[in-house]
């Protein structure tokens, strides 16, 4: 990097921060935080615990957004002033230090962009994730289990907690179906970018001839809904089946039919839960899963109608990403257009940067 490249980078980053400031309005956030502080000091604030919880979540979200904005604004100002000073004094050592720190400065601005992008109504919620292998038998089942592990590792890296809701093991390898709840700040905001079809190209370990295979798995992500959000489900529109739950490898088969499957006829959505020994609890969780899926479906319809020229790129039916392991190694996201060669790292859950690239690319459209 040289002086010209760094000065151009500063211009680009200043434009970004300026645009973000015009959207988030830092002064308005400060005003709102003062209002919340006054509310919290009111003796009657905790009389309505539910409302107090909602305001508490809002405070956390906008405090983090303001903090990220101030960090980015100050870091950019400091770098700009130091650059002007070092340039005027021809201080080569300081200039080189600024050039070396340029990626860190870009990361600070990206952090601000992401906190702005994750300020949507549902972004802060927990996420319900389901993975379904496509046609292709054992190979597709194995691909679904690789994706499942990738998300578990991602959650581990981010400090998210995972609760398995349903797990159906494949006959030879992998899995037939899995649903799990991801708990943590902005879990849905990040994982919503994973909605869609994931394609794998590799030499199959299950093919004795060592041929190249292409497999598909669909990933469906919906926000865990608060109890106060009403989703109407008519009794005539669903079928509820009860069956015996089983653990991995057919272990721990329940003697009672505690597992629950709900089929929603109008949409074809099927949800299953065998997480608990209690049929009643599994049924309640399955209904929660169904409501979340129906809510997500409605959100997608609204996005599609709002964008008449092109359907939403976050959708269950879109092929969103290709993972090529043979004849070369590359993961390419169809929405951001970014390609990554660190395939092993990605399959080990290092997907945050890739997801953030998608969120930024979709916002830019």
Swiss-Prot record:
Gene3D superfamilies, per the entry: 3.30.160.20, 3.30.70.1660, Release factor (1.20.58.410)
Principal cellular location given in the protein's record: cytoplasm
GO molecular function per UniProt: translation release factor activity, codon specific
Subcellular location: Cytoplasm
Residues where N5-methylglutamine is found: 251
Entry keyword Signal: no
Changes after translation: Methylated by PrmC. Methylation increases the termination efficiency of RF2.
Keyword terms of this UniProt record: Cytoplasm, Methylation, Protein biosynthesis
Family statement: Belongs to the prokaryotic/mitochondrial release factor family.
Function per UniProt: Peptide chain release factor 2 directs the termination of translation in response to the peptide chain termination codons UGA and UAA.
Protein name: Peptide chain release factor 2
Natural source organism: Campylobacter jejuni subsp. doylei (strain ATCC BAA-1458 / RM4099 / 269.97)
Record gene name: prfB
């Amino acid at each position: 990097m040289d002086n010209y490249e760094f000065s151009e980078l500063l211009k680009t980053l200043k434009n970004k921060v300026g645009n973000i400031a015009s959207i988030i309005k830092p002064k308005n956030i400060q005003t709102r935080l003062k209002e919340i502080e006054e509310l919290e000091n009111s003796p009657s604030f905790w009389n309505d615990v539910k409302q107090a919880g909602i305001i508490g979540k809002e405070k956390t979200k906008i405090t983090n957004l303001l903090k990220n904005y101030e960090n980015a604004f100050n870091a950019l100002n400091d770098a700009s002033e130091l650059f002007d000073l070092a340039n005027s004094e021809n201080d080569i050592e300081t200039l080189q230090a600024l050039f070396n720190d340029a990626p860190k400065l870009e990361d600070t601005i990206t952090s601000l962009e992401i906190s702005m992008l994750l300020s949507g109504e549902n972004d802060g919620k927990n996420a319900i994730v389901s993975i379904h292998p496509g046609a292709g038998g054992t190979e597709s089942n194995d691909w679904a289990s690789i994706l499942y592990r990738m998300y578990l590792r991602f959650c581990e890296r981010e400090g998210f907690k995972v609760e398995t809701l349903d797990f159906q093991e494949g006959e030879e390898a992998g899995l037939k179906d899995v649903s799990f709840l991801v708990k943590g700040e902005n879990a849905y905001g990040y994982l919503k970018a994973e909605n869609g079809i994931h394609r794998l190209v590799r030499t199959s370990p299950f093919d004795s001839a060592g041929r190249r295979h292409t497999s598909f798995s669909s990933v469906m992500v919906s926000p865990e809904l608060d109890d106060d959000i009403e989703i109407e489900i008519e009794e005539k529109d669903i079928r509820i089946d009860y069956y015996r739950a089983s653990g991995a490898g057919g272990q721990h088969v329940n003697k009672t039919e505690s597992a629950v499957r709900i089929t929603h006829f109008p949409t074809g959505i099927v949800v299953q839960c065998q997480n608990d020994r209690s049929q009643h609890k599994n049924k309640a969780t399955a209904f929660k899963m169904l409501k979340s899926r129906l809510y997500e479906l409605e959100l997608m319809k609204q996005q599609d109608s709002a964008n008449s020229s092109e359907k939403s790129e976050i959708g269950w039916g879109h092929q969103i990403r290709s993972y090529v392991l043979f004849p070369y190694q590359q993961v390419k996201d169809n929405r951001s257009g970014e390609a990554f060669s660190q395939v092993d790292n990605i399959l080990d859950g290092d997907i945050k940067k890739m997801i953030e690239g998608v969120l930024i690319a979709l916002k830019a459209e």
